[in-house]
């Protein structure tokens, strides 16, 4: 074999080894990605300095056995380890970004509605983002989560002035979503109109049906006013702001009115001074709470035409030493005398036993969720 042929043979052998090294490095990178997935799943940190130091030590010992320079092995594998860490960090960052993007909150109306304020408050506390879609009814808000367009839906369920929001309660009976939390918002309604609009000149008011109910005493002072329902308070404010008409006004929140260059004609007009609305957060997955002190379950109970249904519920809970936090109901049919009960109870770890007792007298039971 000539010298030239010998060199060519050796170089070809090295080329094959280099290709094998590339393939091995690619396989190592894939394993690093698998490790990143496992770390995210189990909430482990990306970097394990102790393991890296131990690995370098073992590799240099192994290298010395093969007559490889210690600094050469340390330098080579330090680069490989650093690349592995960067690969994992990049993957985890992308994973978290995608997860964050998916965790959107749907709510009624647009920017400036009370539902938007509630969603904003919840998003800030739990590091979520708000959807940019505008939903004009409660049903569409729920559907957005059922169809995985959003991760969470936020809906008003009760107001101190107007009471239960029946439309939402009816939707809760049908949806497969679960309640995972709640939040409270002060609904300080204002009468908003174009600047320099005298209150006596106003003829028509725009708002969602709930503010009309919550400000009924104030509205009754002006019997000639015509009331026009909108899908949300933000829509009402936008409409009044858009129209060049000083005979119309909107009920809504002051800050959003100011953003739309409307003037506060009257404030603190709710029937109750401390007008609070409770919102619930719905999701496809249940939450599991291990802290007994904060463990609540909401249950929907549909009466079996039984006038003593409320008494039965209270007796069963009392017998099992379960604290009743809240009991609300509404009549679905005056003819059938059917009532739907919603209860919140504390520390319910014997749920199956309780459900068996309820089913003796109750037509339908549905657990809405824990929070």
Swiss-Prot record:
Binding locations of substrate: 11, 28, 39, 48, 52, 84, 88
Question: Does Lyase show up as a keyword for this record?
Answer: yes
The UniProt keywords, alphabetically, are: Allosteric enzyme, Amino-acid biosynthesis, Aromatic amino acid biosynthesis, Cytoplasm, Isomerase, Lyase, Multifunctional enzyme, Phenylalanine biosynthesis
Biological process GO annotation list? chorismate metabolic process; L-phenylalanine biosynthetic process
- One example GO MF annotation: chorismate mutase activity
Positions of the Chorismate mutase domain: 1-92
Superkingdom of the organism of origin: Bacteria
Task: Quote a single Gene Ontology cellular component term.
Answer: cytoplasm
* Positions of the record's site feature: Essential for prephenate dehydratase activity: 277
Domain Prephenate dehydratase: from-to ranges: 104-284
Q: Which Pfam families match?
A: CM_2, PDT
Which EC numbers characterise this protein's activity in its record?
A: 5.4.99.5, 4.2.1.51
Reaction catalysis annotation: chorismate = prephenate; prephenate + H(+) = 3-phenylpyruvate + CO2 + H2O
Q: Where in the cell is it found?
A: Cytoplasm
Map out region (Regulatory) in residue numbers.
285-371
Q: Which Gene3D superfamilies match?
A: Chorismate mutase, Periplasmic binding protein-like II
State the pathway, as annotated in the record: Amino-acid biosynthesis; L-phenylalanine biosynthesis; phenylpyruvate from prephenate: step 1/1; Metabolic intermediate biosynthesis; prephenate biosynthesis; prephenate from chorismate: step 1/1
What PANTHER family has UniProt attached to this entry? PREPHENATE DEHYDRATASE P PROTEIN, PREPHENATE DEHYDRATASE-RELATED
Instruction: Give the domain note.
Output: The regulatory domain shows changes in the ESRP sequence, which is involved in the allosteric binding of phenylalanine. These changes suggest the desensitization of the enzyme to inhibition by phenylalanine and would permit the overproduction of phenylalanine.
Q: What does this protein do?
A: Catalyzes the Claisen rearrangement of chorismate to prephenate and the decarboxylation/dehydration of prephenate to phenylpyruvate.
Q: What is this protein called?
A: Bifunctional chorismate mutase/prephenate dehydratase
Q: Which gene encodes it?
A: pheA
């Amino acid at each position: 074999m000539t010298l030239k042929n010998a060199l060519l043979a050796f170089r070809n052998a090295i080329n094959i080894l280099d290709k094998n090294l590339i393939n091995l490095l690619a396989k190592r990178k894939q394993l690093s990605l698998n490790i990143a997935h496992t770390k995210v799943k189990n909430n482990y940190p990306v970097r394990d300095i102790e393991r890296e130091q131990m690995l370098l030590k073992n590799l240099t010992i192994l290298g010395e056995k093969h007559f490889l320079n210690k600094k050469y092995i340390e330098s080579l594998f330090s680069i490989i380890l650093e690349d592995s860490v960067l690969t994992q960090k990049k993957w985890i960052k992308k994973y978290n970004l995608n997860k964050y993007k998916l965790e959107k909150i749907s709510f009624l109306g647009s920017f400036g509605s009370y539902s938007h304020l509630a969603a904003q408050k919840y998003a800030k506390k739990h590091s979520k983002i708000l959807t940019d879609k505008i939903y004009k009814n409660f049903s569409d808000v729920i559907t957005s989560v059922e169809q995985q367009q959003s991760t969470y839906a936020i809906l008003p369920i009760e107001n101190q002035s107007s009471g239960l929001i029946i439309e939402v309660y009816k939707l809760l009976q049908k949806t497969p979503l679960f309640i995972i939390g709640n939040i409270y918002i002060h609904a300080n309604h204002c009468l908003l109109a174009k600047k320099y609009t005298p209150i006596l000149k106003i003829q028509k008011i725009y708002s969602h049906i709930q503010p009309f109910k919550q400000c009924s005493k104030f509205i009754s002072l002006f019997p000639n006013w015509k009331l026009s329902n909108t899908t949300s308070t933000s829509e009402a404010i936008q409409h009044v702001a858009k129209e060049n008409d000083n005979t119309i006004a909107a009920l809504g929140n002051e800050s959003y009115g100011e953003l739309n260059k409307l003037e506060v004609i009257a404030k603190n007009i709710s029937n109750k001074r401390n007008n609070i609305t409770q919102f619930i957060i719905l999701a496809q997955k249940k939450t599991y709470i291990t802290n007994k002190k904060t463990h609540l379950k909401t249950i929907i109970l549909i009466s079996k035409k039984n006038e003593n249904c409320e008494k039965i519920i209270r007796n069963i809970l009392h017998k099992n030493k379960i604290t009743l936090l809240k009991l609300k109901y509404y009549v679905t049919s005056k003819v059938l005398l059917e009532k739907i009960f919603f209860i919140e109870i504390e520390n319910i770890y014997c749920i199956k036993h309780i459900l068996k007792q309820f089913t003796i007298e109750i037509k339908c039971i549905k657990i809405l969720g824990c929070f």
